[in-house]
């Protein structure tokens, strides 16, 4: 550090009534004002020379005016010798250690770090010219510059600084004034305090002082204050629609009306508003104000040229408390920091780069905290040195500094810079946390009957009412409308298939009623209401097998089914009572992704399959001869060989086939009377209908493409943020509405959604309640246990795997989960549905994932250039509740629902399947097979696991997925849940092929036995004890519960030669020596030559 200052050894105390600023002489003092003593380290409080401290009794405080100068007198006794001893120890501290010590100090109310908005203003005062401060750049997270034309802001970009300007900034802080915790309420007072301090450091003539003060009090012109009178309103782009322009009658942030500014309020003195003038909202960019976090403070960087100066005036000021200085900052927030650099004319670009450096490091997370907690100049220098210790240097011959670097999508965490024992920014090898992906109190076995269920209820009860309050959002309305349409079609389709399999004993109306009743109960009382219940393929296979068995052995299907359902419900309740859901911790990412991928692929496959099957009803008339179009016909004729069903129909309705004029019948009349269609223009089920299949394909793919496009509209560059967010939230609903209107206008008879319009059982020979025994023999009560066991496994696996996927840590759920409570609700409603002869419903994976994705929360207040942060999921019960309430009311809405084309719903299925695949690591790894190594994405697991092991893991997972698909598509689909359970054992076997470290990166670690846990814990404690013995130096705990080597003489020996102290090495550089020489020259020389 450059020495050689001839300034007096003392501390100036600027005082007003009840106000005092801590002034640090820095380079002007011959003593470094810092002591690291044992007692102070233990208490995390440091005694600084220059600050009045009570010693034994309260000292009397003298009050002085700004212009008075006071120098402390006194000898250097014992305290001074202790300071020298501390200095010797300090010389061996790295900047990182000093910063850790500063950040470890206790916080008080006046030094709590806030978010900062930094503004760079520049001025050039020359004789005879009227100058004003002009805003040239601003920082909220990234740098934005006023473009050369002065009409617009640049895109946010990552600031690139020259190392030379950083060295110059450090020199400024060493040789300039540092005033910490200044108490002032106006820019005039701040200017007087700064100039008073400058008079102690150098001789300022009255004319220079007046000129500098005049410069500091000049008016500030901000970019948003451009003339609006010349702007024609129609010229405003659509991107500004929705942005609030400045309005004197606007509401302020607290909701209070700000009245128009009166003439007296607009009086200015020396270009600055009076002390008590209110904020003039006509000069505030309210749209940009929304991006500033609540409670943020301002950091003003003022640099410029003044022709009367022969050497620079530098000052760093921290106000306490922060003060709202009207007209100084672009937005009306209180100012906490000021950095002032005024120098001779001719070096404006140099001052600009120093100002950019100051503003940029103020946005640095670590230096930002240091600036708030600094007690003196050396703390700020330690912060800059630590910043320099972490910077990355770009070779001058390989990079153009004028290129603006786009802000990264994800900003790396700076927590590693707060970790002790990591010298020079070298990050130690970080191992992933060795616990499983679902560890938590929800899955701990209590050992008590229904213990897990009781804990689930206690965990969810405090959040119950908030589950309804949190639903007051347009996002929930969009989610509800989208998922209602998405849930209706599979429920009705499942009911139709079930009706075909059971000869109408359970059909569409029962499916609709069962889904509505089960969904409402689950949404009201389940532990995780984000899960959506639906029908599953294995359940349909089970129903088919059971119906065939009952038909072969002359048993009542509905009665036996009711018994099996009751036994299944009872067994599920037993699983709840025994905390069996704790076994979920064995379901790792390997099993989750295989199961979720299969369900997503099934959604995609079935959507395309249903579209293809439309060709059977609406065939394509291929190889048409255009010259013979006039000869095409399709007529209704008498069946040549009527079957018994047709003859019985004619007999029941007294129809004489020979007397019917078949050729004159309409299509519907011909079908009703069991006639046949004959002719070259006939299809499978009647006359050929042109264009239907192709129009259905258009609707199908258009729905998928438009939904996907509108969903990503949130990240586009068009329209304001609020409009983009709303379009993105309502993407699927808007798509369905658009396609329905388009289909109605085109008029092509596409297949429509068929909803039952009467609320009664499908068959007249059954009611809404089923006798569990009925006509069946008594032994069926006991025999029903066997298929109930299989059903229990089916229900448990489907429900819990979906619950695990929804409750993953990546979703940042805050209200906890309830595996036991979820399973209880499914079991109870399964029993109710069995008694009422309704289908069984369990958690639907794709619908649940889609529900969660539609409720994602992102930060609204994001800095320009910063990607919105994912905050979590809007956890509430209302969307699921309304989906199933409206589903139950669908019977009375057939007049509207009949207009929805089925291809549109198939397109929604395709969209849900594809969108649910996003974020599944298995598909990311699958794509690696077709990529050369140099083009592969920078996935974190590729850094730590060999590529061949990654491919092996993916192949095993792919093989399991193919096996699951084969079983699912075969008649043996009823054992599908057993195969999903087998995946857990396959994953356990993989422990033999992969190391624990590799699996921790590719998958979640499976729980180990209690004995092995104890052995591992004991071994870890022994290793840590040996490590502590090998490391020298005293250790003491910080508030962050980390260990930091106390600064002392013992740290002077460094066993690692690569560990350097940048504060020691910097003075050895030629650049720093040149700066030091210049700063030590006479007053005529500038330190920036």
UniProtKB/Swiss-Prot annotation:
It catalyses: 2 hydrogencarbonate(out) + chloride(in) + Na(+)(out) = 2 hydrogencarbonate(in) + chloride(out) + Na(+)(in). SUPFAM superfamilies: Phoshotransferase/anion transport protein (SSF55804). It comes from the Eukaryota. One of its GO terms (cellular component) is glial cell projection. Disulfide bonds join 634-682, 636-670. The keyword Glycoprotein applies. It holds the Pfam family HCO3_cotransp. Homodimer. Mediates electroneutral sodium- and carbonate-dependent chloride-HCO3(-) exchange with a Na(+):HCO3(-) stoichiometry of 2:1. Plays a major role in pH regulation in neurons. Mediates sodium reabsorption in the renal cortical collecting ducts. This is Electroneutral sodium bicarbonate exchanger 1. It comes from Mus musculus (Mouse).
């Amino acid at each position: 550090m450059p020495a050689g200052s001839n300034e007096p050894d003392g501390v100036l105390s600027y005082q007003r009534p009840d106000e005092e600023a801590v002034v640090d002489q820095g380079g002007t003092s011959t003593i470094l004002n810092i002591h690291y003593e044992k007692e102070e380290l233990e208490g995390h409080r440091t005694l600084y020379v220059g600050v009045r401290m009570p010693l034994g009794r309260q000292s009397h405080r003298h009050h002085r005016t700004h212009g008075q100068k006071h120098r402390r007198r006194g000898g250097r006794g014992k305290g001074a010798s202790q300071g020298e001893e501390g200095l010797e120890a300090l010389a061996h501290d790295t900047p990182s250690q000093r910063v850790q010590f500063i950040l470890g100090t206790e916080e008080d109310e006046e030094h709590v770090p806030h978010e900062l908005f930094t503004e760079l203003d520049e001025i050039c005062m020359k004789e005879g010219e009227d100058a004003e401060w002009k805003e040239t750049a601003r920082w909220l997270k990234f740098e934005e510059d006023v473009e050369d034309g002065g009409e617009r802001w640049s895109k946010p970009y990552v600031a690139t600084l020259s190392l030379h300007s950083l060295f110059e900034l450090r020199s400024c802080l060493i040789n300039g004034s540092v005033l910490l915790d200044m108490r002032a309420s106006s820019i005039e007072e701040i200017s007087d305090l700064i100039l008073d301090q400058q008079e102690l450091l150098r001789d300022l003539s009255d004319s220079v002082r007046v000129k500098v003060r005049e410069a500091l009090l000049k008016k500030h012109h901000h970019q948003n204050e451009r003339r609006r009178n010349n702007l024609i309103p129609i010229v405003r782009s659509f991107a500004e629609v929705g942005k609030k322009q400045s309005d004197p009658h606007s509401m302020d942030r607290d909701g209070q009306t700000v009245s128009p500014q009166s003439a007296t309020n607009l009086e200015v003195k020396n270009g600055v508003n009076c002390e008590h003038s209110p904020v003039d909202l006509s000069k505030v960019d309210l749209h940009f104000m929304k991006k500033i976090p609540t409670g943020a403070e301002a950091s003003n960087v003022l640099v410029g040229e003044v022709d009367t100066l022969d050497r620079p005036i530098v000052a760093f000021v921290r106000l306490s408390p922060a003060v709202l200085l009207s007209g100084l900052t672009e937005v009306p927030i209180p100012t906490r920091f000021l950095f002032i650099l005024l120098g001779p004319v001719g070096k404006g670009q140099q001052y600009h780069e120093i100002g950019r450096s100051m503003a940029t490091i103020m946005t640095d997370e670590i230096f930002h905290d240091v600036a708030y907690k600094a007690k003196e100049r050396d703390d700020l220098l330690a912060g800059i040195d630590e910043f320099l210790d972490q910077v990355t240097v770009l070779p001058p011959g390989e990079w153009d500094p004028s290129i603006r670097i786009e802000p990264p999508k994800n900003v790396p965490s700076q927590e590693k810079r707060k970790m002790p024992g990591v010298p020079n920014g070298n990050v130690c090898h970080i191992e992933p946390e060795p616990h499983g992906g679902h560890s938590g109190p929800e899955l701990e076995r209590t050992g008590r009957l229904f213990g897990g269920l009781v804990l689930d209820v206690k965990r969810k009860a405090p959040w119950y009412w908030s589950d309804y309050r949190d639903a007051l959002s347009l996002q929930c309305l969009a989610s509800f409308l989208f998922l209602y349409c998405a849930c209706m079609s599979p429920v009705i389709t499942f009911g139709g298939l079930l009706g075909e399999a059971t000869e109408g004993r359970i059909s569409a109306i029962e499916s609709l009623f069962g889904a509505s009743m089960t969904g409402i109960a689950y949404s009201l009382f389940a532990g995780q209401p984000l899960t959506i219940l639906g029908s599953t393929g294995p359940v349909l296979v089970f129903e088919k097998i059971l119906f065939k068995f009952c038909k072969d052995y002359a048993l009542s299907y509905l009665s036996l089914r009711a018994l099996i359902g009751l036994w299944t419900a009872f067994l599920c309740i037993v699983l709840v009572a025994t905390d069996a859901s704790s076994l979920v911790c064995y379901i790792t990412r390997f099993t989750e992704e295989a199961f979720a991928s299969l369900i997503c692929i099934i959604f995609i496959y079935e959507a395309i399959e249903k579209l293809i099957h439309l060709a059977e009803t609406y065939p394509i008339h291929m190889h048409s001869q255009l010259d013979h179009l006039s000869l095409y016909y399709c007529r209704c004729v008498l069946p040549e060989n009527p079957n018994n069903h047709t003859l019985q129909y004619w007999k029941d309705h007294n129809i004489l086939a020979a007397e019917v004029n078949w050729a004159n019948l309409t299509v519907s009349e011909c079908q009703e009377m069991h006639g046949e269609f004959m002719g070259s223009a006939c299809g499978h089920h009647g006359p050929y209908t042109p264009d239907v299949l192709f129009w259905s394909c258009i609707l199908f793919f258009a729905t998928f493409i438009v939904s996907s496009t509108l969903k990503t509209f949130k990240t586009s560059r068009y329209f304001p943020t609020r409009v983009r967010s709303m379009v993105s939230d309502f993407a699927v609903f808007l798509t369905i509405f658009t396609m329905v209107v388009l289909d109605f206008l085109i008029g092509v008879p596409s297949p429509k959604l068929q909803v039952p319009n009467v609320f009664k059982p499908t068959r007249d020979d059954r009611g809404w309640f089923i006798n569990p025994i009925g006509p069946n023999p008594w032994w069926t009560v006991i025999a029903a246990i066997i298929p109930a066991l299989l059903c229990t496994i089916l229900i448990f696996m489907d429900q819990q795997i979906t619950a695990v996927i929804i409750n993953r840590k990546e979703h940042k759920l805050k209200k906890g989960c309830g595996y036991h409570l979820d399973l209880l609700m499914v079991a109870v409603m399964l029993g109710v549905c069995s008694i009422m002869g309704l289908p069984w419903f369990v958690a639907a994976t794709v619908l649940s994932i889609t529900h969660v994705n539609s409720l994602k929360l992102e930060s609204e207040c994001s800095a320009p250039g910063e990607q919105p942060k994912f905050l979590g999921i809007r956890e509430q019960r209302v969307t699921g509740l309304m989906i199933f309430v409206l589903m139950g009311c669908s019977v009375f809405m057939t007049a509207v629902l009949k207009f929805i084309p089925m291809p549109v719903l198939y397109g929604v299925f395709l969209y849900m399947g594809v969108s649910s695949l996003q974020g599944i690591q298995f598909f990311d790894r699958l794509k690696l097979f077709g990529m050369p190594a140099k083009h592969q994405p920078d996935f974190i697991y590729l850094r730590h696991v060999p590529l061949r092991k990654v491919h092996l893991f993916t192949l095993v997972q792919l093989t399991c997925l193919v096996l699951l698909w084969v079983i699912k598509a075969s008649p043996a689909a009823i054992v599908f849940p057993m195969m999903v359970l087998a995946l857990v054992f396959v994953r356990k076997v993989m422990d033999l092929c992969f190391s624990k470290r590799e699996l921790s990166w590719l998958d979640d670690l499976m729980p180990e036995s209690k004995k092995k846990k104890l052995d591992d814990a004991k071994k870890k404690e022994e290793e840590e004890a040996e490590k502590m013995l090998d490391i020298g130096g005293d250790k003491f705990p910080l508030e962050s519960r980390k260990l930091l080597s106390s600064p002392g003489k013992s740290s002077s020996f460094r066993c690692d030669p690569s560990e350097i102290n940048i504060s020691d090495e910097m003075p050895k550089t030629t650049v720093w020596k040149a700066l030091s020489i210049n700063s030590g020259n006479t007053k005529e020389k500038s330190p920036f030559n």
